[in-house]
Amino acid sequence: MTITGILKLARLLRLLRVLRRIEQFAAYGAAVLMLLMVSFTLIGHWLACIFYAIAYMERPHLPQPIGWLDSLADKYDMPYLANDTMSGPPIRTRYITALYFTFTSLTSIGFGNVAPNTNAEKIFSIFAMLLGCKSLV
């Protein structure tokens, strides 16, 4: 083995140290990515609950059934009845629809198939879009 071969071997050992360091940073990056995904999901859940609560609280006070809950009920052909709190689409469908809306608003995709119709829903949507822009920056 020559001296140049030994020097090249020392460089190879340095490269292995660099690779180990990169692996440590990759594990850190995966943890940060997981934390971001969990926090984004939690924020989306909270916003979906708020979006549903706005529509649910506002529904009895609207002169016409124009909220997103009423649009969803029309789409599923399951109308809300006057004195029946269990009428309308199943709660699972309402939650998934609200969650879908908040994620499309937070990520600024906004397909528009679930849309805010009342002023309160529109104000909430503006807030969700601004929050989504802030979280992406």
Predicted regions and their residues:
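Pore domain of cation channels
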Residues: 1-10, 32-44, 48, 84-137
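Pore-domain transmembrane helices of cation channels
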Residues: 1-4, 9-82
